[in-house]
Amino acid sequence: MAYYSMPKASAELKRKEEDEVDSTLRFGFRLLCSTALHPLEYAKTLIQLGYEPIAPRPGRTLFGAKRMMLPNIFQYAAYIKSVDGFIGCFRGLSPKILGNVLSSYYAEKLSVVLVGKMSTRFDDPSFNWFEANLDDINEYMETKDGVVEAMPGGMLRKAVAHVCGVVISHPFHVISIRMMAQFIGREHMYDGLFGSIKEIWLHEGISGFFSGIIPRLWMDFCCLTITSGITYLVAKYLGANKTVCGHVNNIAHFSVTSVFYPYHVVSTCMAVHGSRLKAGNPPLMDYYVNWNDCYARLLLQRQHKRGSSFFFRAVASTPAKMNGAFAPYPELK
């Protein structure tokens, strides 16, 4: 028995090591892509904050309608480069990367403490339900008594790990956003990581590190739950294979994220709101009682989709008040 178990144990150990290497490579690739695309993320953040330094011009939408068109995301990033140079396009990158690294390392460990140790391969956080085939799902659903489980343990663990990751990374997320928001008022309060931590701690306390976390958690929870539910139902009741489930998951994720995108805008605004930055105070930003008030006002002003489009950025409506965040609007003739 020992002779036969040795090769099996060796193969299992080798497979585990390969999975760890693949996971590390995937994470490194994500960091590389995040670094390369940071200038676009920088521009998107400023757009979400409502800062439009370049005046719109008469143009046409994707469907040919005449509208006042704002510059696309690449033109916006080029404007940032013209002001702060190439290095300035990567402002806020270091805390974002640090938050991602800490989140990736500690989120899974913390989820094990909260939920408990995994007992089956389906409880493993690395097990991707989106890539599971119908046989995997049937294997999980069938118990000894033929009773269908109501709550997939693997999905619960994944949700807990995701929430832990957001909580761990959010203080660095706030610092990153505020570093980028300094571009609007040309301040230097958040130039370094330790200086930024001191600034938030002295003027806002511990709550300042978690500004805007509730709408972010709400958006992520809704996207994860709905996307996973759609993929699971398609795999279970339509008999879709792994490839089809992957396509369904991508389409569902894109659609659901688009629906809940306004909460992303709210989270970004609340991350800056209440700070000493000009971008987070009147007249550049309204005073909000809480994130619900922020959402309601953005929705009323038709500004809740700011930054959702990279191209064909049409002006939704003329701002109710010219607060200095907008360049003068020309007339459409």
Regions found by a protein language model. Name each.
Residues 1-28, 55, 62, 108-207, ...:
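Flexible extramembrane linkers and terminal tails adjacent to transmembrane helices
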